[in-house]
């Protein structure tokens, strides 16, 4: 069955099964997976998952106890989920995106999310792989953001605009893997804010970059930060770079 047909079937059924390896089934079918993570009546008629463990009625699913970070991430990696509502002592959601409380970080955006995303004020960091594989087209950071972890936006194939805000001072600096915007095919132009001192390794590797503006004051560029950017024909390096 084609992916589009499967998505429509799931929407029509109103239920899904979240399993390992991103395998799912409808209420009339059996899961092909060996290890089922959790079966629940998640209302996805609008690709919206209500997962408040304290809720016992309405359109939200009822769970016995709170969900772990791993369980939440597995749910959000279901490509048919666009929105989640959840709250416990450690995690909460704003506009359908999962955050941690202390420190406040973006933990995971649903893979099925589309359009523009504005990260909540007060957020300090974007966690590892937080937006990886999402279908968002643009993202806006608050000035409170100070760190972006490895692979945060890797393979966001529709991402075409990033507003870094006025707070972040390094983009991928100090990361182990880097690859923050690797595979972002439609990210053609990027303006690095004036306060940024470092761009980490592999940050824009194999992306669609055609033009990038680097500010005076930038001190370090990691290895292969712009590697395999075949459409990037020219780049002007600021004099502030430390050789």
Regions of interest found by a model, annotated:
Residues 2-99, 104, 108-125, 133-147, ...:
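Structural signature of tandem-repeat unit edges
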Residues 129, 150-152, 178-180, 200-203, ...:
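Consensus positions within tandem repeat domains that build extended binding/scaffold surfaces
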């Amino acid at each position: 069955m084609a992916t589009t047909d499967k998505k429509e079937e799931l929407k029509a059924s109103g239920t899904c099964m979240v399993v390992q390896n991103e395998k799912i089934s409808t209420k009339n079918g059996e899961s092909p997976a060996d290890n089922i993570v959790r079966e629940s009546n998640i209302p996805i008629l609008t690709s919206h998952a209500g997962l408040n463990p304290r809720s016992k009625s309405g359109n939200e699913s009822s769970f016995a106890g709170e969900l772990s970070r791993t369980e939440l991430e597995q749910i959000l990696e279901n490509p048919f989920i666009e929105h989640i509502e959840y709250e416990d002592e450690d995690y909460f959601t704003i506009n359908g995106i999962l955050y941690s409380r202390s420190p406040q970080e973006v933990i995971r955006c649903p893979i099925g999310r589309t359009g523009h995303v504005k990260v909540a004020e007060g957020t300090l960091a974007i966690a590892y792989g937080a937006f990886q594989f999402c279908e968002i087209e643009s993202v806006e950071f608050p000035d409170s953001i100070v760190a972006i972890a490895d692979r945060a936006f890797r393979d966001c194939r529709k991402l075409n605009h990033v507003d870094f805000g006025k707070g972040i001072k390094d983009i991928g600096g100090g990361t182990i893997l880097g690859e923050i915007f690797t595979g972002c095919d439609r990210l053609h132009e990027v303006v690095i804010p004036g306060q940024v001192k470092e761009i980490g390794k592999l940050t824009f590797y194999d992306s669609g970059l055609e033009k990038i503006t680097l500010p005076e004051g930038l001190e370090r560029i990691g290895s292969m930060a712009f590697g395999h950017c075949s459409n990037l024909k020219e780049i002007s390096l600021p004099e502030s770079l430390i050789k």
